[in-house]
Amino acid sequence: QPKNGEITAQQIKEALREDTILVSTMYANNETGYMLPVKEIADVVKHHPAAYHVDAVQVIGKLPVYPDELGIDFMSASAHKFHGPKGIGFLYFNHVKFDKFLHGGDQEDKRRAGTENLAAIAGMVAALKESLNCYQENMEYVESLKQQLLSELDGIHYYINND
């Protein structure tokens, strides 16, 4: 069982079955802040026929994420989490083949029928670029807030996820 909500690559390995076709994890838990060991999990899953999906909603625009370096097959994110338009997101996928899930048109390289919301897509791209351009400045600010909080907790026992 996960301790403090922390899932390890070994636990994923032990949970894989012969009929497992997809492993899907969060990159970071939105309530606890725990960041899963995505690269290590991907290293486990690559030795199995299953595909690996990562829900990166909580980290996109806050941390640099390179799906190819992580070794994941699918990654999803939502623009509103990095100050983009609501109602738009994206699905990254590498070489994995999958059947279309909405039939009727040839949009999205014949993977999904329907007209793309180009204005929302452009807004999402602009917001993501801006988030990544401000990454270092934002991380320094968040780190200063963390240090301020920790100084106030002096003498109090506490636990920090991922430390």
Regions found by a protein language model. Name each.
Residues Q1-D163:
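Pyridoxal 5′-phosphate
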